[in-house]
Curated annotation (Swiss-Prot):
Tissue spec. comment: Highest expression in heart, skeletal muscle kidney, liver and peripheral blood leukocytes. Lower expression in all other tissues.
Organism the protein comes from: Homo sapiens
GO biological-process terms attached to the record: anatomical structure morphogenesis; calcium-mediated signaling
Region (Disordered): 1-23, 202-241
InterPro entries found in the cross-reference section: Calcipressin (IPR006931), Nucleotide-bd_a/b_plait_sf (IPR012677), RBD_domain_sf (IPR035979)
Composition skew (Polar residues), residue ranges: 7-19
Entry protein name: Calcipressin-3
GO cellular component assignments: cytoplasm; cytosol; nucleus
Region (Calcineurin-binding): 183-203
Protein family: Belongs to the RCAN family.
Subunit structure as annotated in this protein's UniProt entry: Interacts with protein phosphatase PPP3CA/calcineurin A.
Record-linked Pfam families: Calcipressin
Gene Ontology molecular functions: calcium-dependent protein serine/threonine phosphatase regulator activity; phosphatase binding; RNA binding; troponin I binding
């Protein structure tokens, strides 16, 4: 009886240990598979490559061009090519990012017509929403009047919003209505307060300066009269032969 109970207990313990090991293996390998899936996710990679410093024969000879294109058609049958002869570059457009990645890994710095083939991924064109989230946004275009940011803002510095300047439009309107020799009543008088009237007058300093230092008038030089008598008299020339 005791042996049977011990045997059953050992069997249960072994079953528990085996199940625990299986669960641990599943957890470990499951996590590794998830990590591998994340590492092998090539959806963010571009689908185009740039081949730089391509041999000139690719742009001139048709056979060399077909030979160059055959290197990449192995990875994708729908691949297209854009040749830039002046820059000696070729843009290779694949239908899938996996094909572009394989071609980049296997053909980068391989020999082609005696030159090493340089392959680089093309820049990924992101949408406007993704670009706004991935880059630092500029500050809101708040109108600033007086305060400008420092040359090197310290850590934690924030732009303070200035209050709009107070403009007395009544005063500007009153000044615009003033004219020479006219008066303008700012405040009407009451029984207990006098009225405020503005009279526009000329500056006394300007009049004093004009009397002390009068402006000198420059007289124009008179044009001399032509010598009429000399022109009317006949002229004789003596010539000795």
């Amino acid at each position: 009886m005791l042996r049977d109970t011990m045997k059953s207990w050992n069997d249960s313990q072994s079953d528990l240990c085996s199940t625990d090991q299986e669960e641990e293996e599943e957890m470990i390998f499951g996590e590794n598979e998830d990590d591998l899936d994340e590492m092998m996710d090539l959806s963010d990679l571009p689908t185009s490559l740039f081949a730089c410093s391509v041999h000139e024969a690719v742009f001139e000879a048709r056979e060399q061009k077909e030979r160059f294109e055959a290197l990449f058609t192995i990875y994708d049958d729908q691949v297209t090519f854009q040749l830039f002869k002046s820059f000696r570059r070729v843009r290779i457009n694949f239908s899938k990012p996996e094909a572009a990645a394989r071609a980049r890994i296997e053909l980068h710095e391989t020999d082609f017509n005696g030159q090493k083939l340089k392959l680089y991924f093309a820049q990924v064109q992101m949408s406007g929403e993704v670009r706004d989230k991935s880059y630092l946004l500029p500050p809101q275009p708040v109108k600033q009047f007086l305060i400008s940011p420092p040359a090197s803002p310290p850590v934690g510095w924030k732009q303070s919003e200035d209050a709009m300047p107070v403009i007395n439009y009544d005063l500007l309107c009153a000044v615009s209505k003033l004219g020479p020799g006219e008066k303008y009543e700012l405040h009407a008088g009451t029984e207990s307060t006098p009225s405020v009237v503005v009279h526009v007058c000329e500056s006394e300093t300007e009049e004093e300066e004009e009397t002390k230092n009068p402006k000198q008038k420059i007289a124009q030089t008179r044009r001399p009269d032509p010598p009429t008598a000399a022109l009317n008299e006949p002229q004789t020339f003596d010539c000795a032969l």
